A protein has these predicted regions:
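Alpha-helical support elements that line or immediately flank enzyme active sites
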Residues: 69-71, 294-299, 507-517, 651
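Non-catalytic terminal extensions that flank enzyme cores
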Residues: 2-67, 90, 347, 360, ...
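Extended active-site and interfacial segments that coordinate phosphate-rich ligands
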Residues: 70-78, 227-263, 286-293, 303-309, ...
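N-terminal catalytic cores of NTP/NDP-binding nucleotidyl/phosphoryl-transfer enzymes
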Residues: 45-107, 169, 229-231, 236, ...
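Residue patterns forming the tRNA-binding/recognition surfaces of aminoacyl-tRNA synthetases
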Residues: 9, 16, 21, 30, ...
Length: 895
């Protein structure tokens, strides 16, 4: 064994062992400042050193840390700290998103308090106010991410609208425009009448609202009769350009090709057949309004229908709506229903719950609206992005999400990239009023390059926020320049993100990177799920079940929150977070604190130069060293597979159960005994194992591990840069581990039987063990002291495996042996009988109460299924417990 530990500040041993009480708040700020001041998170590009890089998904500049951020950041930080300790050349590049509509709405609300609108200020003055707001409030989320312990290289922080990113955005836009992949066109988009801008799908929140399904008759144009349609949106009737039925619907086959008179207008519209129509919905006959419904728009394209826009951008009706011109859309709805009723065309209405889209920023009901927008042609870009995943260049973890990704790209539509906002990357296109030239330019223009006219104006729209985000893996590293950072760390190693933005962000980064870098943006896409509450419900304001991560950090510490977010977590699946779990992990941190305190209190005479010979290790020493080596292997293997939850569970089990609960108890006798050599060996093992636990746990719980490691004997300036612990093959003891495990099984059996018999904790007992293996028999004979210290066993009698079993004893079967606890003289049988009889009487009342409930027909009829199931489960448990009481009483009668 050639590993040495150097006691930092050995003259201050008293100060080092005086850890005091564990107070997370007292240590977290201290160590984060230490890491930043010492440049721990910063690496320079180093040729010949293996790179590892992650770009932080940029939170909105308006953002407050929520549980989704906390999970996302924790998973990334674990990977980054792990690779940093493994000696990789690491970059974790942070940044913030300008969050177009979210930020603009914030500032609009701010100036509204002054009685102003953005139009009162004008574009330039309004943007000045937005930049002021960004400078004042935009760093909040960064400070909160720091509180979580995220070890980002803040010296390289980027902003989606800084000069570096802005240059990349212009280069990409103009390049795509020059290739014919960006165009202007009239298409249907999500439209917010209040914000007066197109919205991406992710900016639309769907809520189930109770509305109505109205039934109307549309008269046939050339004969008697009518077709009956059902709609949730009567206000769009003036924009109808067809009525559609399913071609398989025999009820309407004879009507296909005929025409109907469109109520409220003087137009006639055709009856068409399209497979999209659901024969079971309403009457199976639907009105088609291509300008105001995305499915109708697609049908309109298939059948070459006219697109008639009947609404203004503020949600009022326009002149194409006839007499309803100028009305609000909902006022128009009422008027149309009234008018069709007067015409005798209203049939009936039914209450119907349906999903209604709302603007995520102002909560206005979104209007599907056909407007002139800028689009990216997606089909040519989708191919290379699909091939990158199909060929395995980029892998999804879990792999099942690759099919989700491919399926979306196979059915991709052109991407609407323009937004009618002021805050954002302004579209770099200019129009010449004199010659009509349309120019896309990488730099601002002052004159038309074709005719020289100065009568030019820039397109007023800005780009979708996701446009700049799609360039994030390479724009943040200085592209289009080939910077040293880009050369070293692109492509990035891993993208960590939720499954909810695979389409909005992951796919877009893929196709932009394949187009402009001719290379994948990341090698792995590590997908995580959502954070849910204790009942598995999504956290939301309406349910009031959200947990504020900053409140959790204040109360329990960042380490406890981080460990909660990762333990039990599996890739791609949702996880549950609630205060009881966080408190449990705060207790784990406290357990480590106390174990370190115990170790430090016994290091007064510690010699860092002492290295034990193998013969000096006890069975318990060898057991814990082998357990450590196995844990080191399991943790590394699981981290490499992105099974971060399994890695955390492995450390938890070893640190709490093996080291704290078992090994420290075996160590006490040797530390306090008369033999100095025993004390030295035990000190060595305690320090060796504990410091390596700190290293293994550091990526998960960075603050407490750094603090404790700094107090323990160590070498190096910071645990964050200490070598990652790899299993030492010179300290492998699998045989001894198996022997100690069998002894522990026997001791656990003794403890369980003592508890079952209600034996006083300090009372020594006698046991008999029937052993089935000679090596185990010898092992028990030479290690009886473990039974004495850990099981309060005064005497052990070893029996032949086929010998007579003792009477009046409790028995337990464990691997390779049977263990018997002799009860005679160990317990007061009369008192024990009285205790069980009392417990039995109380249990009989519970059984009667629960049985009464389950025999009550009213309860069974009214109670929810899960409540009834719980009562049945409870009754089964009670009855099982009653059986065990009866068995115990029979046993006591024989003593």
């Amino acid at each position: 064994m050639k590993e040495f530990f150097y006691l930092q500040g050995v003259d201050d041993m008293d100060e080092m062992k005086d850890l005091g009480k564990y107070e997370p708040g007292a240590i977290e700020e201290k160590w984060y400042n230490f890491w930043e001041e010492h440049g721990v998170f910063h690496d320079e590009p180093e040729e010949g050193k293996e790179p590892y890089s992650i770009v932080l998904p940029p939170p909105n500049v308006t953002g407050q840390l929520h549980m989704g951020h906390a999970l996302d950041n924790t998973l990334q930080d674990i990977l980054i700290r792990y690779k940093r300790m493994q000696g990789y050349n690491v970059l974790w590049l942070p940044g913030k998103d300008h969050a177009g509509i979210a930020t603009q709405v914030k500032v609009e609300k701010q100036i509204a308090e002054e009685g102003l609108t953005k139009y009162d200020l004008g574009r330039e003055k309004f943007l000045e106010r937005v930049w002021e707001w960004k400078e004042k409030y935009g760093n909040t989320i960064g400070k909160q991410i720091r509180r979580l312990g995220s070890s980002c290289d803040w010296s390289r922080e980027r902003f989606t609208m800084d000069d570096v990113c802005a240059r990349a955005v212009r280069e990409v836009f103009v390049s795509l425009y020059e290739k014919g992949l960006i165009y202007q066109g009239f298409r249907i988009t999500n439209w917010c009448p209040r914000c007066q801008t197109a919205l991406s799908d992710i900016e639309v929140e769907h809520e189930n609202d109770m509305g109505h399904l109205w039934y109307f008759d549309y008269p046939l144009a050339d004969e008697e009769g009518a077709v009956r349609i059902a709609t949730t949106r009567p206000e769009t009737i003036p924009g109808d350009t067809a009525v559609a039925v399913n071609p398989k619907d025999e009820r309407y086959a004879h009507l296909v090709g005929k025409r109907v008179k469109l109520p409220t207008t003087d137009r006639e519209i055709p009856i068409i057949a399209d497979e999209y129509v659901d024969m079971e919905y309403g009457t199976g006959c639907v009105k088609i309004t291509p300008a105001h419904d995305p499915n109708d728009f697609a049908m309109g394209e298939r059948h070459h229908l006219e697109t008639i826009v009947i609404m203004n951008k503020d949600g009022t009706m326009n002149e194409k709506a006839g007499r309803y011109n100028g009305m609000d859309r909902y006022e128009c709805r009422k008027e149309i229903i009234k008018d069709l009723t007067d015409m005798g065309l209203f049939v009936k209405s039914e209450e119907k719950e349906h999903a209604v889209g709302h603007c995520s920023r102002c909560h206005t009901v979104v209007e599907p609206l056909t407007t002139k927008q800028w689009f990216v042609k997606m089909k040519p870009l989708a191919g290379p992005a699909m091939e990158a995943v199909q060929s395995g260049k980029t892998k999804f973890v879990p792999e099942r999400f690759s099919s989700t990704y491919i399926q979306w790209l196979e059915n991709i539509h052109d991407w609407c990239i323009s937004r009618q906002l002021w805050w954002g990357h302004r579209i770099p296109v200019w129009y010449c009023d004199d010659c009509g030239e349309v120019i896309a330019s990488r730099t601002d223009l002052e004159a038309c390059p074709k005719c020289g006219s100065k009568h030019i104006r820039q397109d007023p729209d800005v780009l979708d926020t996701w446009f700049s985000s799609a360039l994030w893996p390479f724009s943040t590293m200085g592209w289009p320049d080939r910077t040293p950072v880009l050369n070293q760390w692109y492509p990035t190693s891993t993208m960590v993100t939720g499954y909810d933005i695979i389409f909005f962000w992951v796919a877009r980064m893929m196709f932009m990177s394949m187009e402009f870098m001719k290379e994948i943006p990341f090698r792995y896409v590590f997908i995580h799920g959502l954070v849910r509450d204790s009942q598995g419900r999504k956290m939301s304001k309406s349910l009031g079940n959200g947990i504020d991560p900053l409140e959790v950090i204040e109360k329990y510490g960042a380490d406890a929150l981080r460990f909660t977010l990762v333990t039990g977590n599996t890739p791609g699946n949702d996880m549950r977070c609630y205060y009881e779990r966080v408190e449990g992990n705060r207790n784990f941190a406290n357990k480590l604190w106390n174990a370190s305190k115990f170790t430090l209190m016994n290091l007064d005479d510690y010699d860092p130069r002492f290295i034990p010979e193998e013969s000096q290790y006890t069975l318990a020493d060898k057991w814990i060293l082998e357990g450590l080596a196995q844990t080191e292997e399991h943790v590394s293997e699981n981290l490499d597979k992105y099974e971060l939850g399994a890695a955390a569970d492995s450390i938890y089990d070893f640190a709490w159960n093996s080291f704290c609960d078992w090994y420290i108890e075996t160590a006490k006798g040797r530390l306090y005994g008369a033999h100095n050599a025993d004390r030295q060996v035990t000190q060595y093992v305690l320090v060796y194992v504990l410091t390596r636990i700190m290293a293994l746990l550091h990526p998960f719980m960075p603050f407490i591990t750094e603090h404790l490691w700094q107090h323990l004997p160590h070498s190096g300036e910071t645990l964050a840069r200490a070598p990652w612990p790899a299993a030492d093959e010179r300290l492998r003891f699998p045989e001894e581990q198996e022997q100690m495990e069998r002894i522990m099984d026997a001791i656990k059996a003794v403890r369980n039987m003592r508890a079952e018999a209600n034996v006083a904790p300090n009372k020594m007992c006698h046991i008999r063990i029937a052993v089935h293996r000679d090596d185990l028999k010898k092992c028990i004979e030479t290690h009886e002291e473990y039974f004495e210290k850990l099981g309060h066993v005064e005497k052990i009698v070893l029996l032949a495996a086929d010998g007579t079993k003792p009477e009046n004893a409790l028995a337990a079967v464990v691997t390779g042996m049977e263990v018997y606890l002799e009860l005679k003289g160990l317990i007061d049988t009369a008192k024990e009988r009285e205790r069980i009889e009392k417990a039995k009487a109380a249990l009989e009342k519970e059984i009667a109460r629960t049985s009464g409930k389950l025999n009550n027909k009213g309860f069974l009829a009214k109670a929810p299924e899960d409540v009834v199931a719980k009562e049945k489960e409870k009754l089964a448990e009670f009855e099982e417990k009653m059986k065990s009481f009866d068995e115990r009483l029979r046993f006591l009668a024989d003593l």
